Regions:
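Short, polar loop motifs at secondary-structure junctions
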Residues: 45-52, 92-99, 217
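Active-site regions of enzymes building and remodeling cell-envelope glycoconjugates
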Residues: 54-68, 86-88, 103-110, 223
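Short beta-strand-to-loop element that shapes/binds the nucleotide-sugar donor at the catalytic cleft/hinge
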Residues: 108-141
């Protein structure tokens, strides 16, 4: 099974990530890769100038395409577009200590499903008010849920390609209509919780996918130091 991480210094965005140094985040990624069970084929998708950080601890390095930052999840969708078949993409602050149990009879799986907060729901309303429904119709479907993308599992190339197509169209709409007017990226406000995490559920509702959750099957097999837990880890560790 291929287990993939995505890293670029250019994607250290957001208030919480900006508190942590580049060096600390790089060490988190290195620890995540080293600690992951050896049964996985370990792959890093990264910039050419950071290959040396990972080349000795992975089985394969894929050089990142030099695309402009739009959403925090861009790197994951970029590498998912390059790889076919069955694979997992993992966050760099997610420590896998045992082989993961995969959901069965699914087309794809993610870490867990949750309910969007008012900020994220507000972002969706902005998309709708600016007319995304005519360009990317899946956004018209009523929905307040999202999928956390800390873990992403794919095994259906056809559905994966359809999901990525919707993601690309959402990116294009955002850069054409949203960023010039609202300047979320310029002001370091992360739209990705809507445009990528909520997008997955919008896609699911329109394509009748079979989506599984890692969280409910793997409670003791990984720890995700996401959000503020990443900052707590800085205080507790000498990584």
């Amino acid at each position: 099974m291929k287990l993939i991480w995505t890293y670029s210094k250019k994607f250290k965005k957001g208030i919480l990530n900006n508190i942590a140094s580049h060096s600390y985040i790089q060490k988190l990624f290195q620890k995540a890769i080293k600690d992951a069970p050896s049964q996985y084929e370990k792959i890093i998708y990264t910039d050419e100038d950071t290959v040396d950080l990972f080349k000795d601890i992975v089985d394969e390095v894929i050089i990142r395409d030099k695309n402009k930052f739009i959403f925090l999840a861009d790197l994951k969708f970029d590498v998912a577009e390059k790889i076919n078949g069955e694979f997992i993409i993992s966050d760099g602050d997610l420590m896998i200590n045992k082989p993961l149990t995969l959901p069965t009879d699914v087309d794809m799986a993610f870490e867990y499903r949750g309910q969007a907060n008012n900020i994220v729901k507000g972002y969706k309303n902005v998309l709708l008010q600016e007319g995304i429904g005519t360009k990317v119709p899946i956004w018209n479907t009523p929905n307040d849920s999202y999928w956390n993308l800390g873990l992403m599992y794919f095994n259906n190339d056809i559905l994966k390609s359809k999901l990525i197509k919707e993601y690309r169209e959402t990116q294009s709409f955002y850069m054409e209509k949203i960023e010039p007017k609202y300047k979320y990226n310029k002001n370091n406000k992360q739209f990705s919780a809507c445009a990528s995490q909520m997008l997955v559920e919008q896609f699911n509702l329109n394509n009748n996918c079979k989506i599984g959750e890692f969280g409910e099957l793997n409670g003791d097999k990984y720890i995700h130091y996401g959000n503020k837990r990443k900052l707590d880890l800085i205080k507790k560790t000498s990584i």
